[in-house]
């Protein structure tokens, strides 16, 4: 049986500003968007007068089964809950492993992804972890992507003392395997790269792009503030760059928006990941935990403190991410798309 809702008088950023309109929802889809919408069937009415209606946020870097911790087994971090996500406007997540492949598995990751889906969220995940050889479910990166519905790419670490110091040829082969599997399964097949502060930077990736036929969009560096100049060089060749939300991110995003095309810039939270603090000799001296709320907090600061317009700011966690990950039903307020919606009171913006 179909269930209908009409959201009335919302100021819609789709993410572009389309003014005050009504939205008709049938089950989990938006089926009409227009001013003064007339609908005669039984339905629930939601008065959104004085509120902004924007797409649900897409967070493409979430430790949904908790990060590994890097200060002993007692520092293992708890798994995320659906309520942790939706209370901060996140309606779609991509889960992944980090340094924790010895104590947590791809099986656990896929199971948690399925659990979030059962609870009503849109959820995906990545095979792999920091390490090479790559941790997989089927024994093959390509088969994981091709045959496991939830898996849309692979995770690896570069330029970090905790990585496996992957060789250029290993990264190139990983990318081609992901690309081929992604084409077969109609998935992005991304190589999602934790990028540390190591001496190598993006050197190997930039050389692969220069020396091979692998499209630069196959590689998706995150934590790009760690190697900002290399990230700009990468973006100048057409690559996507993903920032990690923290208190310094809004000003860096503002700077980047003046240099890099908007569509290539995304933001993620690293929620429930471990945030180790290192001294100059790479000894651990402290530990933090990534928080889901930093995603929206960074966008809010980008609007209020850096004076970036609302449409541009929210694109970084909605449309841009959806387009980059081939999530065609996500990321914008349009007829026929998933009804992943966030309502914001004016006080929030």
Give each language-model segment a name.
Residues 1-5, 11-54:
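Histidine-rich, glycine-flanked metal-binding segment
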Residues 48-111:
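Metal-associated gating/positioning segment near the N- to mid-region
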Residues 99-110, 121-214, 221, 226:
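Buried, small/hydrophobic-residue-enriched core segments of structured protein domains
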Residues 347-349:
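Conserved small/polar residues in nucleotide/adenosyl-binding loops
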Residues 162, 177-278, 284-285:
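Active-site core of metal-dependent hydrolases
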Residues 10, 28, 50, 61, ...:
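Divalent metal-coordination and catalytic microenvironments
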